[in-house]
A protein has these predicted regions:
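Beta-loop-alpha module in the N-terminal Rossmann-like domain of NAD(P)-dependent dehydrogenases
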Residues: 53-76
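N-terminal Rossmann-like dinucleotide-binding module
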Residues: 1-50
Length: 76
């Protein structure tokens, strides 16, 4: 069992990026995956994550890979 909570972010736009920043503030958490169909949003969000992570453009692929313990849904 890991010592941190692994978060997946669904929606990498402005709200998703704010959630990434907030997870980064937590000692026992990190973002391990992000998902957004927009490549530009994925690229912007990727710059905020300092650890290893996976990025997806398809939500089914994200869920099937089971990269996270919890998901934050930040979509409109």
């Amino acid at each position: 069992m890991s010592n941190f909570i692994k978060y997946g972010i669904i929606g990498a736009g402005t709200m998703g990026q704010e959630h990434i920043k907030n997870v980064n503030l937590l000692d026992n958490a990190k973002v391990t995956s992000i998902c957004d169909p927009n490549e530009g949003s994925l690229n912007q969000s990727s710059s905020l994550i300092t650890n290893d992570f996976n990025s997806y453009r398809d939500i089914d692929e994200l869920i099937n890979n089971d990269d996270a313990d919890a998901y934050i849904i930040a979509t409109p």
